[in-house]
Amino acid sequence: MELSNYRLGDLIFIPGLFDNKLLHKIINDYPDSFATKYIINQSKKYEDNLTAITNIVLDFIKNNKHLFPDDIQESTVIHLRLGDVIAGNTWHEKQKRPLDINDMKDILKNDMNKKYVIGKQFYCDTSSINYNECNLLSIKYLNEVLVSFNAFHLENTADIDLCCGVMAKQFFQGRGYFSKLIVEIRKKLNLPVIETLTTIE
């Protein structure tokens, strides 16, 4: 199972987790990413974290509209955190279990927008090692969400997924700091969000 160190939400909200070695690894592994642009930007001229990443995202959207669905601004984007949190055994994985689909249906019962789903399976070096179980249950959960909401899964990079979440008419928050980042950018831009979390990130 491929492990990832591309944790953009963590980088913005809990930067103390990232030492210089890890920052350089992100730059080397993801040279054209939002994370790399953010790291370089902050090393040259420090800005408020949210302001810096918001400007990077908006600039990318402005110059790459061909990468997004034509109707993304008329749609609801649902973020799903998949992978280790589905069946992992660590405390942080258990805290980030996805919402029950019936609860999602209740929250979205009056939402008539077309639905897109963003998010893919994520594993890092602190994930539990029951990868096969997490993989199978992630696929099952994703498919159930897609069927329940007649939704389309956008299988893009994390950066493009983030842009879709920001551009959408409505955004449904999932688990983790990546989803929180989309929420906070949308709030900064005075865009609506469906928040599903309070203290658990």
Language model regions located:
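Donor-binding and catalytic core of enzymes assembling or modifying cell-surface/extracellular glycoconjugates
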Residues: 113-200
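Secretory-pathway luminal glycosyltransferase catalytic domains
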Residues: 1-114, 121-127
